[in-house]
From Swiss-Prot:
Residue intervals of the tr-type G domain: 39-223
Name of the encoding gene: GUF1
Organism: Lachancea thermotolerans (strain ATCC 56472 / CBS 6340 / NRRL Y-8284)
Stated name of the protein: Translation factor GUF1, mitochondrial
Organelle targeting peptide span: 1-26
Task of the protein: Promotes mitochondrial protein synthesis. May act as a fidelity factor of the translation reaction, by catalyzing a one-codon backward translocation of tRNAs on improperly translocated ribosomes. Binds to mitochondrial ribosomes in a GTP-dependent manner.
Top-rank taxon, per record: Eukaryota
SUPFAM superfamilies in the cross-refs: EF-G C-terminal domain-like, P-loop containing nucleoside triphosphate hydrolases
């Protein structure tokens, strides 16, 4: 029954927004596509901070190029995941082909738009998307100005030699401050004010008149050669319950047709193309894909793990004359959680669901693990805490699966006295005190450089927040007359994933923005904090943290967990322990059973005998018995 529900959820998501094209419509699209030369191709992306209007601008571009019709039903067209629509953020980069007739030149153009995420946790999606583009729209909210992730994504696009078109969005808002936004773009990115385009993605102001012509004029066409042997860069992949593994590819050189035999450069496995086509905005089957185009192919791939992002796909027999493309650097997971099925009997089906979802999000690392408290599960690695939260939501929405997720932890490095190093991602693997004293030279934790932008009036509160999270100030910049401040702090990643972004939004009244990048490991005084029930450690609840946090967190843990443990027939002692030292203790008194209820009030000796027997029985139960903790208690505590 659960498997049927899972398939229903997947199919409903897949077909909810599918555009059905007749054979006549498809033929017309293919004829138009064939008549456009590669010099009239424009592949571009949109660079922006979260909530600056990327998805809305994408909708207007699709609308003005005839891909979709205007209307409320066509909102966030490229945000195809249910979790994207609920949260109002882009998570997966999506591509769409558009046709645009330029009346100035009387020429037809083929545009490939890649709508990318803005949040730092999905930077790997952004990086892969830029590899298929010749340019990008640098989008800035007229009311908020340049934000932290605008800066980070700008430098990423700039480093990949993309032609950037500065665009100020939301000019129709009463709170819009266009001169301030222009000044920030000019001073922060050194882009000429004359090149800035002002638009309203919501109303469509200047999108058709100014922005589309600028894309044609300023963004260069792809540089591939149609007569060279076919090679394509594998940009993304996903699992379709009807087609199997689907690959999103950028055709760098040559032509590929339905029925062609292709080979993977990384695995050496050969496949026959069952179907291929363009995204318009959903899959539209075509006869072939040419140089410079971005589209999908269905290779009949049997194993999900064979779809390796950054792989080069080429024709069978042409391996010796086809140069392999530079792939992508594998994203490095920096936040790890333990994941366990809410219902232990569904481990096998949940394992299949997680494996399929990982195919669509290759930045997730996956490893089996088991817990004494929660049973069989997985150790999952993510790019950030939002990434982990989104993965859990997608699993629930797309597959109907329920997970228990432990508190996030970051990778720590152990340096031994003999020169060896070990990275641990599970608190259960943290060395005990005796090993630390004899064989360990140092313990290190990951640090990041956090870039924070905020209005000057909240500067004091934000500096205090950073210092309370062991931040070290490296730079403070006042952005001219705009009233904005840019802060740079070195900070332990462990503090950043502990809802630092939520705390920043709170102290800055929602105006602060955050971006960060990894800067390596530093020696640190870190210890493992355990929750102990009647002398037995609960492995799923252990966490590694800095010594300065231990007492505060330990007291909070013990007090909080007491709320979720039901009273037993014997006394339950809850302790928070670090380095074999008890930090905090809470006691749940034994549930009393009235063994005297049936006795006569005058039978004193019998009463004493039964009470002594009850006391001895409870003592024995405490020494040999296991405390019964239900799954709901763990879930409630982990949601704290």
């Amino acid at each position: 029954m659960r498997r049927l529900r899972s398939l229903y959820l997947q199919s409903s998501i897949c077909f909810r927004r599918f555009n059905h094209y007749s054979a006549k419509d498809t033929e017309a699209l293919q004829r138009r596509l064939e008549q456009i030369p590669i010099e009239n191709y424009r592949n571009f992306s949109i660079v922006a901070h979260v909530d600056h209007g990327k998805s809305t601008l994408s909708d207007r571009l699709l609308e003005f190029t005839g891909v979709i019709k205007a209307g409320d039903s066509n909102r966030q067209v490229l945000d195809k995941l249910e979790v994207e629509r609920e949260r109002g953020i882009t998570i997966k980069a999506q591509t769409c082909t558009m046709f645009y007739y330029d009346k100035r030149r009387n020429k037809d153009y083929l545009l490939h738009l890649v709508d990318t995420p803005g949040h730092v946790d999905f930077r790997a999606e952004v990086s892969r998307s830029y590899a298929s583009c010749g340019g990008a729209l640098l989008l800035v909210d007229a009311s908020q100005g340049v934000q932290a992730q605008t800066v980070a994504n700008f430098y990423l696009a700039y480093s990949m030699n993309l032609k950037l078109i500065p665009v100020i969005n939301k000019i129709d808002l009463d709170s819009a401050n266009i001169p301030q936004a222009e000044a920030q773009i000019e001073s922060t990115f050194e882009l000429p004010r004359a090149e800035i385009i002002r638009v309203s993605a919501k109303t469509g102001i200047n999108v058709k008149e100014d922005l589309l012509p600028a894309i044609i004029d300023r963004i260069p066409p792809p540089t591939g050669v149609g007569k060279k042997p076919f090679r394509a860069l594998l940009v993304d992949s996903w699992y379709d319950s009807y087609l199997g593994v689907v690959l999103l590819v950028n055709i760098v050189d040559g032509v590929v047709k339905k029925g062609d035999r292709v080979v993977s450069a990384q695995t050496g496995k050969k496949y026959e193309i069952k179907e291929l086509g363009i995204m318009y905005p959903d899959k539209v089957s075509m006869g072939c894909l040419r140089t410079g185009q971005v589209g999908y192919i269905v290779p009949g791939m049997k194993e999900s793990k064979d779809a390796k992002i950054g792989d080069t796909i080429m024709h069978v027999g042409k391996e010796s004359v086809t140069e392999v493309l530079d792939g992508f650097e594998d994203p490095k997971p920096m936040v790890f959680v333990g994941a366990f099925p809410a219902d232990g009997t569904e481990f096998k089906s949940l394992d299949e669901d997680i494996t399929r979802l990982v195919l669509n999000d290759r930045s997730v690392s996956l490893q089996r693990e088991s817990s004494n408290a929660l049973g069989q599960g997985w150790r999952l690695g993510f790019l950030g805490s939002l990434h982990a939260s989104v993965f859990k939501d997608r699993l629930e929405k797309e597959y109907g699966s329920k997970l228990i997720i432990t508190q996030p932890t970051v990778p720590y490095v152990i340096k031994f006295t003999n020169g060896e190093e070990k990275i641990i991602t599970n608190p259960d693997d943290f060395p005990d005190l005796s090993l630390r004293k004899t064989r360990i030279d140092s313990l290190q934790e990951p640090y990041v450089e956090a870039i924070i932008t905020l209005p000057q009036e909240y500067l004091g509160a934000v500096i205090k927040l950073c210092e309370n999270n062991r931040g070290i100030q490296k730079e403070i910049t006042y952005l001219n007359v705009t009233g904005q401040v840019l802060l740079k702090y070195e900070m332990p990643l462990a503090h950043l994933v502990d809802d630092f972004f939520g705390k920043l939004k709170s102290v800055s009244r929602g105006y602060g923005s955050l971006d960060y990048e990894d800067i390596g490991y530093k020696a640190s005084d870190i210890v493992k904090l355990e929750l102990v029930l009647n002398g037995k450690s609960v492995d799923a609840l252990a966490q590694v943290m800095h010594r300065s946090q231990v007492e505060r967190v330990g007291r909070k843990w013990a007090k909080k967990f007491k709320e979720y443990v039901k009273s037993q027939l014997y006394e339950v002692v809850i302790q928070a322990r670090a380095n074999n030292k008890v930090i905090a203790r809470e006691t749940i008194k034994a549930r009393r059973k009235d063994v005297l209820a049936k006795l006569h009030a005058s039978d004193v000796s019998r009463r004493k005998k039964l009470l002594v027997k009850q006391k001895e029985g409870k003592k024995q139960m405490k020494s040999v018995g296991n405390i019964q903790i239900n799954q709901e208690a763990y879930q409630a505590f982990l949601r704290r």
